[in-house]
């Protein structure tokens, strides 16, 4: 959202960002050109996500709505009303409700891929037909309405069905009338899903990805980045390092984390591993590492608490990315032409992993067993298969460059977006 706001401001549009002080919000002093509105989220904090994601989002929306509505009413004269447009994250449905109540146009920004919206749209239908939650016999089957994705790739499998349906209907699909939909993707990456969305919603759909390549801002990371890892990468051979990062939310059992460590050690290849404090259940940081591996891992790799990911992926030493396949990580990886080892956990990560392995063919899903991990790293860094994946990833990288430059699809989409906002 900050990247989008920065771009729109550069095009002469006045921007106010509603933010939640309890949630690692950007430092307003770093962005004097923007106005920031702190919203009251009650006593809610990031730690409350552990109580359940659905409940967390519902509570956040409930707590923020009154303050946001009051701000708009107090600062909106009859003249101002004609110039106010609300751009909201798709999970912040309260902003869409307020826009409807006050007669303001609203635009939805989706930070996930396009197919996440189409998948969420069909879940209620699949449930009515007895196909969601999918029985075991269907898990490996392709969903006819969502080729080439399988039932096992659907988001929210394993969640209580009533919560999933409510999330799909109330939160994930824009039921409040929206003037347009923005998606951080590219036309050539998701043509089928984008066609379905445009046919279904009948509103302009602007593909404005990858945002991190189009708009340069200060780091938007919610964790402090350890930039010393770049100096370490500078000393490594080209395409010799596997970069491992499972995002900012995933939690691992000790057994899984130890298996990952053993696999990295067995591979005999260099690695840069992001282990967030508290990422492994029951441990503050890397205390889970077997004593027998500590020396070996220090000699071959580097473990950091957080890394400047876009800089790491662009580094010549990085030959593969072992990822949870969050959409930001996926599109950042594609933009640098790096093959992926996929370890998805939830939400759109399963869909992204399927894209990587079966559509774009720039990576594969990894089995969490030390021997399998060692073989997977070899596949990416050494084997001919890895080189073929790298070539396909580099082809996508070149297409991304074309898309974000003058005359490209994302470049033109941004220009069209500015004209559209100005017309509202």
Curated annotation (Swiss-Prot):
Chain sites annotated for binding UDP-alpha-D-glucose: 248, 306-307, 324-332, 346-349
E.C. number(s) listed in UniProt: 2.4.1.-
Q: Name one GO molecular function term.
A: quercetin 7-O-glucosyltransferase activity
Tell me the enzyme class: transferase
Q: Which UniProt keywords apply?
A: Transferase
Indicate the family of this protein. Belongs to the UDP-glycosyltransferase family.
This chain's function reads: May glycosylate diterpenes or flavonols in leaves.
| Name this protein carries in UniProt | UDP-glycosyltransferase 76H1
**Native source species:** Stevia rebaudiana (Stevia)
Q: What is the lineage of its organism?
A: Eukaryota, Viridiplantae, Streptophyta, Embryophyta, Tracheophyta
């Amino acid at each position: 959202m900050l990247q989008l706001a920065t771009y729109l401001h550069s095009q002469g549009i006045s921007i106010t960002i509603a933010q939640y002080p309890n949630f690692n919000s950007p430092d307003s002093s770093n962005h004097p050109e923007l106005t920031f509105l702190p919203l009251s989220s009650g006593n809610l904090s990031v730690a409350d996500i552990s109580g359940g994601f659905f409940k967390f989002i519902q509570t956040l929306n409930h707590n923020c709505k009154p303050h946001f509505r009051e701000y708009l009413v107090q600062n909106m004269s009859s003249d101002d009303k004609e110039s106010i447009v609300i751009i909201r994250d798709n999970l912040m449905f309260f902003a869409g409700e307020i826009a409807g109540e006050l007669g303001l146009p609203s635009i939805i920004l989706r930070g996930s891929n396009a197919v996440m919206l189409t998948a969420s749209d069909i879940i209620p239908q699949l449930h009515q037909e007895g196909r969601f939650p999918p029985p075991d016999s269907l898990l490996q089957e392709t969903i006819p309405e969502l080729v080439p994705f399988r039932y096992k790739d659907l988001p929210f499998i394993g969640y209580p069905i009533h919560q999933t349906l409510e999330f799909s209907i109330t939160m994930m699909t824009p039921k409040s009338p929206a003037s347009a939909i923005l998606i951080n993707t590219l036309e050539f990456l998701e043509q089928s899903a984008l066609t379905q969305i445009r046919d279904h919603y009948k509103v302009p759909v602007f593909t404005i990805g990858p945002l991190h390549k189009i708009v340069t801002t200060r780091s938007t990371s919610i964790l402090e980045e350890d930039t010393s890892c770049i100096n370490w990468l500078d000393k490594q051979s080209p395409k010799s390092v596997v970069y491992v990062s499972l995002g900012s939310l995933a939690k691992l059992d000790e057994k899984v984390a130890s298996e990952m460590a053993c696999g990295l050690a067995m591979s005999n290849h260099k690695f840069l591993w992001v282990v967030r404090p508290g990422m492994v259940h029951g441990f503050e940081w890397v205390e889970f590492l077997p004593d027998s591996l500590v020396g070996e891992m220090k000699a071959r790799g580097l473990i950091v608490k957080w890394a400047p990911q876009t800089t790491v992926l662009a580094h010549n030493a990085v030959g593969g990315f072992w990822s949870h396949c969050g959409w930001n990580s996926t599109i950042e990886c594609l933009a640098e032409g790096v093959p992926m080892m996929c370890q998805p956990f939830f939400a759109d990560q399963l869909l992204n992993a399927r894209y990587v392995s079966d559509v774009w063919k720039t990576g594969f899903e990894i089995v969490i067993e030390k021997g399998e991990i060692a073989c997977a790293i070899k596949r990416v860094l050494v084997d001919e298969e890895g080189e073929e994946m790298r070539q396909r990833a580099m082809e996508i990288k070149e297409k991304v460059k074309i898309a974000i430059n003058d005359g490209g699809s994302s470049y033109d989409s941004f220009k069209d977006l500015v004209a559209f906002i100005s017309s509202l």
